[in-house]
C-alpha cells in the first residue's frame, strides 16, 4: 500500500500549482487547442475514456492527450510538482496515496461552480439540469463549505451489504431489516460454520460508517459527526454506533484482517461468494471486479444487495451512494477548454459510452454517471442495484469535512483502518473511541472554511 505523500512534498506541489503558472493555451502550432486529461484506470477499464475523448474532440474540435494508469498518482504527482499539471484529472478521494485529499487541503483545485451553469457541449441543457439532485451539495464536491463546487461527481454507485441470494433462498433465511435481526442471523450462521460478516479492506468502512451514522441519527448526527462537533462522540447516537461496530467485529470472519490489503482483498470478497461469510460492504463495481472469479464457483450463487439495517423496527435503512470525482488542478494551463471537457462528461453521448463500452476482457464498462433517468436504461444486476432506493432504502451522501494538514492524522487512519485491529482483538473499542476523540479535537480546530 502506497504511503501518503509527505507534507514536504505536498508543500512543493502547492508551490508548483501556483508559482509561475499564468494560464496558457497548449496548441499544435496550428491554433488547435490540446488539453491533457489524466484518468485513473479501475475495473471500468480504460477503453471508455478513449472513446469519450474522441467524442469530445469530434464535438468541440479540442484535441485530448489522454493518460490512464492504475497508479495514476505516480504519474501526475511529479507533473503537478513540476508545474506541468494535467488540465483535467479523474481521481477520487479514498485512494491509499491520498493525492486528491492533499490537494484539497492545499487549496489546489480549480473552482468548478461555473461548469454547473454551462450548457453541455452539443446539447441544450445545462450541466446542473443533467446531474441528479444532491450530488453537487455534498462535502465531497464542496469540500470547503463555501457554497462552491470544486469536484465534479462521477460514476455513482450505491453501496450496501452484498450477499449470496441463492444461499439465503436455500437456507430459508430472511435478509435482516434491523440490527437485532442481524445478530440473530449471525448466531444461526455461526452454528453452520459461516461468519456473519467480512470486508474487502478497512477502507470499505467509509461508506458503511456513513450509512450507519444516517441510520442511527439521521442527517443531523451525520453532519455533526463528520464535522467533529465537540462532544459528539459522547452522545447516545455515537454510543449506539460504537456498540454496533464492536459487536460486528466479533461476528467478522477471523481471516479478514490478514487479507484486507490491496493484494489479497479479493479473497475476502470470495468469502461471500463461496458461502464462508454472509455479508460484506461493497459497491456495484463488485460484479465486474469479480466476474471472472464467479465463473469458477462450484456453489450456487447470485448477487444480492441490501441497505444497512435500521436501528429499530420501523426505522429506515440507508445505502450510501459512493461516487468518484473529476477535477481541474489549480495549475492547469487550459482551464476554459478543461471546463468544456468536464461539462461534456454529462452529455448523453458520454453517459452512454461510460456505461456500455466493451472492455478488453469482453465485459461492459458499467460506469454510471449521476444523471437523471439513468436507472430506466439498466437491466440485470444493475437494475437491482440502482433501484435500491426504490425499495425503501434512503440515500446517504457526504463524508468527513476537510481540515488543514495535521501530521500523522487523517480520517482513514483514525476511523477506518483501526477496524482491522478491532476485529483482530489487538485494539479495544474503548481505545478506538479514545483515539477518535483525541483526533477529532485536532480536526475540529483545523477545519477548512
Residue ranges of each PLM-predicted region?
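Extracytoplasmic/periplasmic substrate-recognition and gating elements
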Residues: 54, 58, 63, 81-82, ...
Amino acid at each position: 500500500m502506497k504511503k501518503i505523500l509527505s507534507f514536504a512534498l505536498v508543500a512543493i506541489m502547492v508551490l508548483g500549482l501556483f508559482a509561475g503558472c499564468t494560464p496558457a493555451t497548449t496548441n499544435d502550432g496550428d491554433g488547435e487547442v490540446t488539453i491533457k486529461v489524466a484518468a485513473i484506470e479501475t475495473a471500468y477499464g480504460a477503453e471508455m475514456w478513449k472513446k469519450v475523448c474522441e467524442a469530445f474532440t469530434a464535438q468541440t474540435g479540442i484535441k485530448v492527450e489522454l493518460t490512464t494508469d492504475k497508479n495514476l498518482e505516480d504519474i501526475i504527482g511529479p507533473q503537478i510538482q513540476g508545474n506541468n499539471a494535467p488540465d483535467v484529472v479523474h481521481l477520487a478521494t479514498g485512494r491509499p496515496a491520498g493525492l486528491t485529499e492533499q490537494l484539497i487541503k492545499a487549496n489546489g483545485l480549480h473552482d468548478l461552480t461555473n461548469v454547473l451553469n454551462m450548457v453541455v457541449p452539443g446539447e441544450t441543457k445545462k450541466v446542473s439540469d443533467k446531474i441528479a439532485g444532491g450530488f453537487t451539495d455534498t462535502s465531497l464536491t464542496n469540500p470547503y463549505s463555501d457554497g462552491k463546487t470544486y469536484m465534479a461527481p462521477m460514476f455513482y454507485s450505491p453501496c450496501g451489504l452484498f450477499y449470496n441470494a441463492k444461499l439465503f433462498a436455500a437456507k430459508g433465511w430472511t435478509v435482516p431489516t434491523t440490527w437485532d435481526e442481524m445478530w440473530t442471523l449471525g448466531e444461526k450462521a455461526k452454528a453452520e460454520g459461516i461468519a456473519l460478516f467480512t470486508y474487502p479492506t478497512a477502507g470499505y468502512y467509509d461508506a458503511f460508517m456513513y450509512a450507519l451514522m444516517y441510520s442511527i441519527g439521521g442527517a443531523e448526527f451525520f453532519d455533526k459527526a463528520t464535522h467533529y462537533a465537540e462532544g459528539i462522540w459522547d452522545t447516545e447516537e455515537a454510543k449506539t454506533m460504537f456498540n454496533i461496530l464492536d459487536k460486528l467485529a466479533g461476528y467478522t470472519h477471523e481471516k479478514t484482517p490478514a487479507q484486507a490489503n490491496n493484494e489479497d482483498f479479493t479473497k475476502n470478497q470470495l468469502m461471500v461468494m463461496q458461502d464462508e461469510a454472509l455479508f460484506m460492504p461493497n459497491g456495484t463495481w463488485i460484479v465486474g471486479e469479480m466476474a471472472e472469479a464467479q465463473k469458477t464457483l462450484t456453489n450456487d450463487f447470485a448477487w444480492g444487495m441490501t441497505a444497512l439495517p435500521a436501528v429499530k423496527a420501523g426505522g429506515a435503512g440507508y445505502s450510501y451512494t459512493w461516487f468518484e470525482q473529476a477535477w481541474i488542478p489549480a495549475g492547469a494551463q487550459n482551464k476554459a477548454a478543461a471546463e468544456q471537457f468536464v461539462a461534456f462528461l454529462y452529455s448523453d453521448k458520454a453517459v452512454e459510452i461510460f456505461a456500455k463500452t466493451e472492455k478488453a476482457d469482453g465485459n461492459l464498462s458499467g460506469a454510471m454517471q449521476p444523471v437523471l433517468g439513468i436507472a430506466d436504461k439498466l437491466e440485470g444486476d444493475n437494475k437491482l442495484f440502482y433501484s435500491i432506493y426504490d425499495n425503501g432504502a434512503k440515500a446517504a451522501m457526504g463524508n468527513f469535512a476537510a481540515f488543514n494538514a495535521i501530521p500523522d492524522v487523517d480520517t482513514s487512519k483514525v476511523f477506518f483502518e483501526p477496524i482491522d485491529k478491532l476485529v483482530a482483538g489487538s485494539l479495544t473499542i474503548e481505545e478506538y473511541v479514545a483515539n477518535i476523540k483525541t483526533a477529532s479535537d485536532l480536526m475540529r480546530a483545523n477545519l477548512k472554511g
